[in-house]
């Protein structure tokens, strides 16, 4: 009668690992052979069963598998075949079934550790031989494994006995698909090969007897597919269960096999012995190495030496090889790589690089780098001017004016003088008849300052009571410390141009103030308005709203414009302002 492992240890099925350990120690002290000298044989068998039960239950995986198959293991009788739906299957087809194999998961069957018929070696060995025979027969049905004789070994066990059959086939490893379990004198290395092979067991059985439905040709296509699907599912489940059961049985027998424990112990002792011998040899060499220093000298082997006469030949070969490599490299030529450091790209040809330079991506990256460099220069104080350099400064305008074509300059001056002469002749008798205003426009790098003079009729001026000027200026932001410098440079340029003696048809030179801000004239009794800041070209002592007229050449002041014009006419102090472009820029008022 089989005994449950939990009952054998005296614990509940939900006992913890600590409770199992305490129960095993208690049972071991009770049934250990040393504690029972009067009944050693019975105590040994009982103690072996207790130890096997504890080894199974102490392993979580083994315990889970035992709990799921406990009823089948404890059942001594094979499964009943009296069911209505069950049918008898030939044993040669099924071989050892899963249910039959579960009957041997009983440690009480392996209490005798000897070579007898009731011992563990013959019981377990015959089971493994039967399993190997089933696999060979299944393989031969599939047209495989014709060279293996595992089925012959099982037949020899029945005819000549297990021990003699093992002796006949133990050395025929090439004729056996699965190694033999052997018996007590079997080598430890052979046993390791046995357990390694059987631990990777995978059956070749078809398990067709596990089909749930009988296949018939009369079924329609849909029914056939469904029947095949369900039958294949049942076969696969049975196949997986069989493989797991065989692997569990291998682990179960390995725990009971003393040969593995003794062999591992002997192998460890041999390893330690060899390690100790190696250490002793090293110590002896170190100890006696100094005494035999003169006698035991290191000598090069014949294959480690090179004859002197061969050195010259080797050097010649090396020199020739170097010349050959150099000539080869010269033939190959240099490989040029074209690289754009801005975009971090490489090109194989110069044409590709040029095409890349014309792309929008390269230009965009180039502009970003230029802006970053400008910002860094301003931050570090490396530039004398700020971002206002993008606009026309006084220095730039002077340099640009020096490069202007003389003919274009003369034509512009003649046009300005003609307009000034006409406006002065019409309104010379009255001060309010002339409304000449000048405006300065600060444009982009390519533009210069622009002068525009508009006149309005007297009737229109009386009606509106205010002169309206249609010129707009662009306000320039500049540093205070550069205003005087730019004004002086512009005055010098105007003076130099005036000295050339350019005159109109009436021999009169008229000069207009180059940089005077125009604005609306305020009415009487009206609120004061904010005046526009004066530009850098005006004298620093003169405000934009002052009524005093000043000669830009000699600096003399006059109360009215007529006096200023008479002075310019007599003294010839006409200052000329060149106009290259006429571009109106709207000014946004903030």
Swiss-Prot record:
Modification Phosphothreonine occurs at: 504
Every J domain range: 3-72
C2H2-type Zn finger ranges: 338-362, 549-573
Note from the entry: Present with 2310 molecules/cell in log phase SD medium.
Keyword list, A-Z: Chaperone, Metal-binding, Nucleus, Phosphoprotein, Repeat, Zinc, Zinc-finger
Places the protein is found: Nucleus
Domain of life of the native organism: Eukaryota
Protein name: J protein JJJ1
Region (Disordered): 269-293, 441-546
